[in-house]
């Protein structure tokens, strides 16, 4: 039983690591996107500032809840970038913008999958440490509940629009 709990806990850590990798990739893509967009809409520099602040906050965040909250804020910022760029037809034809948009869409899909996998393994782990007889072993060896990766803001539950082919 103990070995099974250790294995599940390691799977939770690995699944969280996969989320962090994809979220970091998105953080890395967005400044490139903002730089591409900035040439078309110079007066929107506050967006770049917001991204920089979120990246700093991400580096300092320690808990799943903190990182989940920052993910929500980043999604909102991304929606703003995409909404503002809608007003610039030349931008939508820019090959660099199109490429970044596709990379971002792929990353969003990977984030979604990673969240789902993480939450599935956390649910399995949390259930295992609560049911008999593994709950006895879990209590003896300090196996504690893990936090699900949840989106608090109902608006943020909507998919980020990254396709301008309409």
Residue map of PLM features:
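A helix-centric hydrophobic-segment signal that preferentially recognizes long
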Residues: 1-166
């Amino acid at each position: 039983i103990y070995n099974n709990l250790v294995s599940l806990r390691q799977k939770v850590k690995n699944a969280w690591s996969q989320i962090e990798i994809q979220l970091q990739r998105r953080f890395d893509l967005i400044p490139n996107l903002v730089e591409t967009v900035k040439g078309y809409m110079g007066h929107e520099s506050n967006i770049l500032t917001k991204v920089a602040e979120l990246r700093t906050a991400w580096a300092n965040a320690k808990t799943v809840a903190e990182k989940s909250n920052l993910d929500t804020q980043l999604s909102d910022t991304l929606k703003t970038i995409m909404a503002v760029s809608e007003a610039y037809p030349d931008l939508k034809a820019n090959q660099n913008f199109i490429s970044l948009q596709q990379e971002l869409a792929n990353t969003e899909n990977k984030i979604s999958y990673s969240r789902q996998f993480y939450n599935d393994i956390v649910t399995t782990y949390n259930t295992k440490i609560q049911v008999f007889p593994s709950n006895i072993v879990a209590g003896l060896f300090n196996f504690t509940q893990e936090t699900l990766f949840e989106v608090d803001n109902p608006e943020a539950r909507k998919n980020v629009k990254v396709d301008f082919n309409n």
